[in-house]
Amino acid sequence: MNLHEYQGKQLFAEYGLPVSKGFAVDTPEEAAEACEKIGGSEWVVKAQVHAGGRGKAGGVKLVKSKEDAKAFAANWLGKRLVTYQTDANGQPVSKILVESCTDIAKELYLGAVVDRSSRRIVFMASTEGGVDIEKVAHETPEKILKATIDPLVGAQPYQGRELAFQLGLEGDQVKQFTHIFVGLAKLFQDYDLALLEVNPLVIKADGNLHCLDAKINIDSNAMYRQPKLRAMHDPSQDDPREAHAQKWELNYVALEGNIGCMVNGAGLAMGTMDIVNLHGGQPANFLDVGGGATKERVTEAFKIILSDDNVKAVLVNIFGGIVRCDMIAEGIIGAVKEVGVKIPVVVRLEGNNAELGAKVLADSGLNIIAATSLTDAAQQVVKAAEGK
């Protein structure tokens, strides 16, 4: 689950980290009032969506009057913001963050993720702030500085000082950076985060450090023990198909291809997507129905896949272990009838009751293509998607 920038900054402020004075508003009139409350002669207004690249898309603007802030809010509230990180439909804007203007001297980067290889929280820092950090890591990896956090003792001040010196900070800036570093580490652990970024972390004209942005992603597996963060969830930012899948305990991720995939098991699902790619196809989704798939869940999975207008064919790849292939076959037949599937469906069944499942499909009289192997399934579904 992601948080909006204004929500992330609220958490930063609770941990004593330096953030701009600002207000999240949902009407143009409130935007003008926020400028009055903040004071000054210049403000930054930002459309709040769960995506980066807002500035280039016109979703961030420096304004010099309350009227301009009001006009910006009127222009964006209720609209959809399309950036390089969203799909073609963009994300709906229901909040505008109005905050004080910051005089920037230099931009840095500071972030943290859970590193699976070391099984530790790893902090990353760079002098290349304000830009796409993935691009920096790819083109100039030597500019990415790292600090690994020991889970037994947590982040230590000396680690913050080491990073500060490597970033070229000096004097009181080292103390400020260490305070921010330790505070972010505590925030990361307290709230079960999966990713945290301050991009940019800026050095202001007066030499002080300031958190100018906040990006927070929470580990969904830990949401049951984070009621405060659950209350911050903005469902308008969710993909409706992914939200539908979550209700049925289906693991679904929308992609940009035209071949729908329904598989039981995450590993098999990834392998299925790979072999579809290998044979020239493009998966439209990742969908794992899980080991305890039921007829109802298979039906809902079909509904989710077919809600994507780009899907031209569906590949169902089931390995029967816990789940019986004949039951899956009945679910497929029920779903095809209930949903009214008009596109080709290729099915590969292996394992528990696979032969019985194949017979159930054959006796159904429906236009379902049976595959003899995974390779055959991939080849058949790619041909079907191409209309061959």
Curated annotation (Swiss-Prot):
Positions bound to Mg(2+): 199, 213
Entry-linked InterPro entries: ATP-grasp (IPR011761), ATP-grasp_succ-CoA_synth-type (IPR013650), ATP_grasp_subdomain_1 (IPR013815), Succ-CoA_synthase_bsu_CS (IPR017866), SUCC_ACL_C (IPR005811), Succ_CoA_ligase-like_bsu (IPR005809), Succinyl-CoA_synth-like (IPR016102)
PANTHER family cross-referenced by the UniProt entry: SUCCINATE--COA LIGASE [GDP-FORMING] SUBUNIT BETA, MITOCHONDRIAL, SUCCINYL-COA SYNTHETASE BETA CHAIN
Family the UniProt entry places it in: Belongs to the succinate/malate CoA ligase beta subunit family.
Keywords: ATP-binding, Ligase, Magnesium, Metal-binding, Nucleotide-binding, Tricarboxylic acid cycle
Catalytic activity: succinate + ATP + CoA = succinyl-CoA + ADP + phosphate; GTP + succinate + CoA = succinyl-CoA + GDP + phosphate
GO terms classed as biological process: succinyl-CoA metabolic process; tricarboxylic acid cycle
Assembly and oligomerization: Heterotetramer of two alpha and two beta subunits.
EC number: 6.2.1.5
One term under GO cellular component: succinate-CoA ligase complex
Signal peptide residue numbers: none
Cofactor, how bound (note): Binds 1 Mg(2+) ion per subunit.
GO molecular function: ATP binding; magnesium ion binding; succinate-CoA ligase (ADP-forming) activity; succinate-CoA ligase (GDP-forming) activity
Protein name (record): Succinate--CoA ligase [ADP-forming] subunit beta
Domain ATP-grasp: residue ranges: 9-244
Binding-site list for substrate: 264, 321-323
Any Pfam family hit: Ligase_CoA
Underlying gene: sucC
Function: Succinyl-CoA synthetase functions in the citric acid cycle (TCA), coupling the hydrolysis of succinyl-CoA to the synthesis of either ATP or GTP and thus represents the only step of substrate-level phosphorylation in the TCA. The beta subunit provides nucleotide specificity of the enzyme and binds the substrate succinate, while the binding sites for coenzyme A and phosphate are found in the alpha subunit.
Residues reported to bind ATP: 46, 53-55, 99, 102, 107
Pathway(s) where this gene product acts: Carbohydrate metabolism; tricarboxylic acid cycle; succinate from succinyl-CoA (ligase route): step 1/1
Needed cofactors: Mg(2+)
